[in-house]
Amino acid sequence: MSNVSTSVTAQYQLNPAQNTGLVAAVRGSIVDLIFEQHVPPIHNVLYAQNKHVVLEVVAQLSAQKIRTIALTATQGLARGMPVEDSGGPLKVPVGPSTLSRMFNVFGAPIDGHTYQHDGKWRSVHQAPPALTKISSQLQIFETGIKIVDVLCPLERGGKAGLFGGAGVGKTVLLSEMIHNMVSQQQGVSIFCGIGERCREGEELYREMKEAGVLDNMVMLFGQMNEPPGSRFRIGHAALTMAEYFRDDEKKDVLLLIDNIFRFIQAGSEVSGLMGQMPSRMGYQPTLGTELAGLEERIANTEDGAVTSIQAVYVPADDFTDPAAVHTFSHLSATLVLSRKRASEGFYPAVDPLQSSSKLATPTVVGQRHYDVARQVKQILAQYNELKDIIAMLGLEQLSKKDRDVVSRARRLERFFTQPFFTTEQFTSMKGKFVSLEQALTGCERILQGEFDDYPESALYMIGEIDEAIKPKQSATEKNSSMNSDLKPSNSESNSPGPKNSEPDNAIPSSAKPNVSQPNTFKQDAQNESLEEPQNGR
């Protein structure tokens, strides 16, 4: 509570409130007030109980009565208590001083450290960029992650949805995108946790700090235990900070929202408390307007771009749910994380066949990129269809063409795995940033059959494709060294010994090669190469 009081005082100390009212009714997070002199306008912030209770005006019921939504807990609030008008809307601090810090919806730091702000505060209620300022040029937002850049490229200044359950690597993937954004593109990352658990937010803060990406990052949290009004406004607060870096600092911003469904859920709670008539499946009637008010502020302008990656929860896996339908209409790319791929050890566990992007067209990504992505998806789809035949009849029953498809598809799957910088402390594997050009070149060489003779393990957890050649070269040199050590010397060959009845140039019967041995060894090696990777490897 002390943080909230300090933040409110910092926001409005230059404009002390003069207008006062009284509490008329308290119904959970909805508080009705009466102002006899001047009714505060919509979105004005009010406070009571020595600024410990913060309210926001959402409706004017009459000439003297207004309805507010509580942004803090309303314990202790009673009828007849005085309420002061702050004279302005909800504001948050902006500027370079916010970097590496964690804030709540009021702009108060919640990371346990003192905050020295530079006096720049901005309202969370901002209009979307004008159409004349929005850049119409479509550009790819390069993440450095092979499977994302090749198969489902993200749009610079666009919105991407990340669908995944618990334990499939969703947070790790978001963390890696933050790391690559800061280290490779010199941008700013903002993480907005809507309805996050306290434990998850604390763990993410420590992971970002240990990964060394916190210096160019801002974190905001509207925690799960907070009132719906706080969770409903935290997304707007994060966008206000992102817009400052885009418009004033002329920087590219990566905005990560987890979870956009909880934003919709908070709006539904507010709508129900206000007594609005629910729409289909119990959602608020203003669902489309509220979501558009948040999503339309994420745009690519001439000064910079705000690129958003949003975690989306689909209730009961029903993609016809109104929350999912309205969210899909704003997304330009969809990343689906597969639990099956995660259990097989393919990290990142992005499903290449279910993920898609609106930018995957020849006019945007280019003809070469489009052809490579189409061929990769075609081979992976054919391999997926052949899995049942392989399980029942075996690989030997396939034609030569189908065996080539299986071999190259499995090598593509392993090539799309990639060690991350944010997991170096857990895997002891150095992270890799792979450019789009390197990823496309690797896919082309695999599709052309250049790596058909290489073991599948050589392509697992590597960066660019040339790293797969080094293990084979080192293995060849090792075998050559072993063969030279086993070769008898001249002195040993000329040493006296028992005479053999066979001529000198004859091959002993015990050393004669078995004709069936090469085929057997080749088949065993082929079967061995088709084994699934172990978890974590």
Curated annotation (Swiss-Prot):
Membrane topology: Peripheral membrane protein
Gene3D superfamilies, per the entry: 2.40.10.170, Bovine Mitochondrial F1-atpase, Atp Synthase Beta Chain, Chain D, domain 3, P-loop containing nucleotide triphosphate hydrolases
Record carries keyword Transmembrane helix: no
Positions with biased composition (Polar residues): 473-498, 507-528
Gene Ontology CC: one annotated term: plasma membrane
Region span, Disordered: 471-537
Catalytic reactions of this protein: ATP + H2O + 4 H(+)(in) = ADP + phosphate + 5 H(+)(out)
Molecular function terms, GO-annotated: ATP binding; ATP hydrolysis activity; proton-transporting ATP synthase activity, rotational mechanism; proton-transporting ATPase activity, rotational mechanism
Residues given in the record as ATP binding sites: 164-171
SUPFAM superfamilies (UniProt xref): C-terminal domain of alpha and beta subunits of F1 ATP synthase, N-terminal domain of alpha and beta subunits of F1 ATP synthase, P-loop containing nucleoside triphosphate hydrolases
Keywords annotated in UniProt: ATP synthesis, ATP-binding, Cell inner membrane, Cell membrane, CF(1), Hydrogen ion transport, Ion transport, Membrane, Nucleotide-binding, Translocase, Transport
Enzyme Commission code(s) on record: 7.1.2.2
Compartments, as annotated in UniProt: Cell inner membrane
Pfam families to which the protein is assigned, alphabetical: ATP-synt_ab (PF00006), ATP-synt_ab_N (PF02874), ATP-synt_VA_C (PF22919)
Binding partners and assembly: F-type ATPases have 2 components, CF(1) - the catalytic core - and CF(0) - the membrane proton channel. CF(1) has five subunits: alpha(3), beta(3), gamma(1), delta(1), epsilon(1). CF(0) has three main subunits: a(1), b(2) and c(9-12). The alpha and beta chains form an alternating ring which encloses part of the gamma chain. CF(1) is attached to CF(0) by a central stalk formed by the gamma and epsilon chains, while a peripheral stalk is formed by the delta and b chains.
Role: Produces ATP from ADP in the presence of a proton gradient across the membrane. The catalytic sites are hosted primarily by the beta subunits.
Annotated family: Belongs to the ATPase alpha/beta chains family.
Name used for this protein in its record: ATP synthase subunit beta 1
Source organism (scientific name): Pseudoalteromonas atlantica (strain T6c / ATCC BAA-1087)
